[in-house]
Amino acid sequence: MKRTIAIVAGGDSSEHDVSLRSAQGIKSFLKETEYVTYIVEIKGTKWEAHTGNGLRAKVDLNDFSFIDNGTKVKPDYAYITIHGTPGENGILEGYFDLIKLPYSTSDVLVEAMTFNKFALNQFLSAQGVNIAKSVLLRKGQAARPTDKDIINTVGLPCFVKPNAGGSSFGVTKVKHAEDLDTAIDKAMAESPEVIIE
């Protein structure tokens, strides 16, 4: 009997479409003789299984099932291809743990820790791992360090990126001090926290 694999894609970040392309690639690699595969697209609270011929079915979040051609489908495994939230920060993994569905990524704690770049750096530093000096900025922060203080801490060139997010959007390599504010604004458009390293 073939196992049913849900290739979970989309997500809530700017990398939604990139994730869908990744899912298509994975689907093409899985042998149809061994697996029944569905792409399950997530965008906010809208979860839909692509059931073929452009049709989609709403996913029942009670058990991650959906109806395909009159038959209830409950995947045996979730292959997570979401770039960013909720696939790389532990949220989706926590849901799958609750419904006891095996999945392809690390567990909740590892995903949550590694998704937050600043928290991971602090953890690794405490373990004796050398890490780059960094500054964390938060949207609406009352007392933000000056550009001069940031550059004195991390040096130039530096990288400005969303603290919790992928590595494709909102990332800038800053070579000149006058470009720092623009880079921070770009990263803040992707995440309420920005890390500068």
Regions found by a protein language model. Give the residues of each.
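ATP-binding N-terminal substructure of ATP-dependent carboxylate-amine bond-forming enzymes
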Residues: 1-109, 113-115, 119, 138-146
